[in-house]
From Swiss-Prot:
It comes from Litoria rothii. GO terms for biological process: defense response. Lacks antimicrobial activity. Does not inhibit the formation of NO by neuronal nitric oxide. Expressed by the skin dorsal glands. The lineage of its organism: Eukaryota, Metazoa, Chordata, Craniata, Vertebrata. This is Rothein 4.1. It is found in: Secreted. The keyword Heme does not apply. GO terms for cellular component: extracellular region.
Length: 22
């Protein structure tokens, strides 16, 4: 998972779904 919106979970875990923000 890319480091977005504080997403620091392992790559084998599905990243949380965030709304499209500018």
């Amino acid at each position: 998972a890319e480091i977005l919106f504080g997403d620091v979970r392992p790559p084998w875990m599905p990243p949380p779904i965030f709304p499209e923000m500018p």
